[in-house]
Amino acid sequence: TWGTYASVIERNVKPAIGAVRLDELKPAHFRRMERYVMDEQGKSSGTAGSAWRTLHKALEDAVLEGVIERNPAVKGTAPRVALKERAALTPEQAADLIAAETDDTWRLMWMLAFMTGMRQGERLGLTEDELRRDGDRLIILVEWQAQHLTKREVEGLPKGVECTPLGNGMYRTRPKTEKGRRAIPLPQALADQLLAYIERHGMNKDGLVFHDDEGIPLTGCVERRRWYRALDRVGLNHEYGPHS
């Protein structure tokens, strides 16, 4: 997301090599940035790799805009990322967590996460317009996501980027890539629960399925707190994520 790109630039790129002119960047500067992220900030190789990819993309855009003639990152080498296996709930653990959830909003959230693979922003930004029918089957046509953006991040978005304020610091944006826009057929039991939930709670003014009692959008921070409570409820530690 654009918010993530801006954050990476501010936290990892500028402090390390922000004083260097674009047309003077060399492979040594990229290595300096990698050392800054990993040695001085104590971050992982994955974070260093994210900074490198973000800068590479920014420089590629600078070439297209005619700001510089070539992308100096082409001669550099991306940091080697040490692969770390993510902890994942077993199907039995996921079923127990869902069954133990006492709030119908979050029970449905966890069901969507585990049964469809929908990402956090896609679930938080789910709208009535994304619900379609294919014969008797209900389909979610993922076209939007909801993400938290600061005023500065919104002002820094390139022209043409679709970004609609939803309230509570949340904005409706398109998925990062075309692959993110996809159709997800729902199992009948999940479809029935989703439609029943909408019947009980209705949409907010922006058509969001998930919102609080006052129609305010839910945020990733709220989900994270509820997720940890759900893990605690079934005796699991916090190493697991709702996308596992």
Regions found by a protein language model. Give the residues of each.
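N-terminal core-binding DNA-recognition domain of tyrosine site-specific recombinases/integrases
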Residues: 1-67, 83, 216-222, 235-244
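Short, solvent-exposed alpha-helical surface patches in well-structured domains
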Residues: 4, 32, 50, 75, ...
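Charged catalytic carboxylate motif
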Residues: 8, 29, 50-54, 93, ...
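Conserved hydrophobic/aromatic pocket- or pore-lining residues that grip, position, or stack substrates
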Residues: 13, 30, 55-58, 66, ...
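Short, basic (Lys/Arg/His-rich) helix/loop patches that form interaction surfaces
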Residues: 41, 45, 96-106, 116, ...
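Basic, Lys/Arg- and aromatic-enriched nucleic-acid-binding interface segment
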Residues: 45-51, 64, 68-126, 133-137, ...
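Short, polar N-cap/turn motifs at the start of nucleic acid-interacting alpha helices
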Residues: 130-139, 237-239
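C-terminal catalytic core of Y-nucleophile DNA break-rejoin enzymes
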Residues: 139-141, 148-165, 172-195, 206-228
